[in-house]
């Protein structure tokens, strides 16, 4: 039989449990709240003289006004970062003749929809070559997409990110771009990370750059302040990403490229004539400089 004193105690315990639930829900909501956008992000959501713009669902697309393009870039946002934060960067890239689509993610977490690229590609059959980029968690998930969908993506740009697994044999034209002041910079360029990326991956450290300036948002926790402007860092990110897309355009039609055939050794020919040290040897046409990138 419940005593008169027992009922208030149960009521108090119930109120405490309810309060704990409310606090937990509030903490979860706060932790998932997206980072505030900067005005430049909102201003990018529209057409400009050198780029067209379209919103598809909750994702954003930028492209050249001519609508003539064959290479597309899909961007996965960082955790708790809205797609619009990458609008100014997408505009810079699209102005050079590319389709750039910044994907929207459930709860702004790319880990909840790693295959978001599939629906985007299905919407654009005119694109014949695809690359993928991502910032932070979005970059890790972009790399995971490359690993789990072999032969689909031809290029990968990691913006302040590193792969969660080995994609060294994927054949993609890869670049890793990060600020030297980013708290995770050492991991992004570590020997372990390099081993998990294709051997010809291009690493682009941005002196004085940080994590947050990969986009146009603010409030990134535990991020050291940058010593260069956001616009300067964005320009370097765009340049390095465009270099990756140029490599994608230069790839052969067959992708991944077939492994070189191993045949019987060629029969030895006559010995080569010695070259006099005084005789100049003409350079092969189109040969690259030893100091080339």
Labelled PLM ranges:
Residues 69-79:
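Short beta-strand element of the alpha/beta-hydrolase
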Residues 81-89, 105, 187-188:
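The serine-hydrolase catalytic nucleophile loop
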